[in-house]
Curated annotation (Swiss-Prot):
It comes from Flavobacterium psychrophilum (strain ATCC 49511 / DSM 21280 / CIP 103535 / JIP02/86). Heterooctamer of four alpha and four beta subunits. It catalyses: L-aspartate + H(+) = beta-alanine + CO2. The active site is at S25 (schiff-base intermediate with substrate), Y58 (proton donor). Its EC number is 4.1.1.11. It comes from the Bacteria. The keyword Repeat does not apply. Catalyzes the pyruvoyl-dependent decarboxylation of aspartate to produce beta-alanine. It is an enzyme of class 4 (lyase). It is found in: Cytoplasm. The gene is panD. Pathway: Cofactor biosynthesis; (R)-pantothenate biosynthesis; beta-alanine from L-aspartate: step 1/1. This is Aspartate 1-decarboxylase.
Amino acid sequence: MQIEVVKSKIHRVTVTGADLNYIGSITIDEVLLEASNIIEGEKVNIVNINNGERFETYAIKGAKNSGEITLNGPAARKVHKGDIIIIMSYARMDFEKAKTFKPWLVFPNEKDNSLK
């Protein structure tokens, strides 16, 4: 049996921008992508701590060490600059493997989205 489990989580990161006119996605600082094992184009779920919105989009790479977290396209309507969000991705795996699987968990500094 296959089940879906949390693979990666960037917990409580601050939105730095919202670009309604971009074609879609979420731009994430490359350092955060690498630390969380999320790849460009991967589907991610977003939970907005400030307003309770939950939605999905896909990740694109932002500049390294920029702290950028920008929601693009229609998703830009779901956030405001300064909102705190959680970014999660999931993976399917065998039920037995899932019992011991450990997700990548990242806890950035909410002030500048750094890992310091």
